[in-house]
């Protein structure tokens, strides 16, 4: 797999982690779970999905219209934030979805801030097979050490966009341009695997998904990622 080399020396590290929470207007109360160091980024609701995105993004034939538009809205919410990062040359960016909850008593910003590799650092999600539709026994669970691990994308991918860290705006630019220039779109976490850049993950996961909230995309959700990048059932 070709990995794009981003020249980190071209960007200036600004000394802080810029923490964004993607949050829908009708779930504004979820922001109470985050302190004032987190910046709210307004999530795009289904009702505001444009026709271009609606047609460009492909979902399975048997999913509901509501689910399809939810996937569209999720993708738009993330990539508009990436565009904001690029336009304003923002570095050291932590992106959370509003159902993310800490798996640690304290958030160790120093460990995350010192991550300055040419890639994306996942702080939560779950391991998945390379192919989206593949038998579970084909899943390769990587051997992980505590802290930051390199993910071999030839064997395993990480799904979900609940929490990830972008060290500089040049990487955000690569992510944005890759997605924008695709002829067709899928759900965002699936597309991110195809961005030509290294993937890393923090183990155990710093953020897991709050199973007390109803998913804004998939109703009656039963499986939630845990700190080991596998699933717990509700």
Regions found by a protein language model. Give the residues of each.
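An acidic/histidine-cluster motif and surrounding catalytic segment
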Residues: 2-6, 10-96, 100-234
């Amino acid at each position: 797999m070709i990995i794009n080399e981003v020249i980190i020396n071209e960007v200036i590290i600004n000394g802080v982690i810029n923490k964004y929470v993607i949050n829908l207007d009708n779930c504004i109360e979820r922001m109470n779970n985050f302190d004032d160091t987190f910046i709210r980024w307004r999530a795009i609701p289904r009702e505001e999905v444009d026709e271009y995105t609606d047609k460009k993004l492909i979902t399975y034939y048997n999913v509901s219209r509501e689910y399809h538009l939810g996937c569209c809205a999720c993708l738009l919410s993330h990539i508009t934030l990436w565009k904001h990062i690029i336009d304003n040359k923002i570095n050291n960016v932590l992106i959370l979805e509003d159902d993310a909850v800490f798996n640690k008593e304290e958030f160790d910003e120093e460990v995350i801030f010192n991550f300055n590799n040419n890639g994306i650092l996942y702080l939560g999600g779950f391991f998945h097979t390379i192919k989206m539709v593949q038998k579970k026994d084909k899943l390769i669970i990587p051997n992980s050490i505590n802290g930051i691990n390199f993910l071999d994308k030839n064997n395993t991918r990480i799904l979900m966009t609940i929490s990830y860290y972008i060290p500089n705006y040049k990487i955000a630019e690569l992510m944005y341009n890759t997605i924008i220039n695709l002829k067709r779109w899928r759900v965002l976490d699936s597309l991110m695997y195809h961005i030509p850049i290294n993937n890393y993950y923090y183990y155990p996961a710093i953020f897991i998904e709050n199973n007390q909230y109803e998913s804004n995309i998939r109703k009656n959700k039963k499986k939630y990622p845990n700190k080991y990048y596998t699933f717990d059932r509700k």
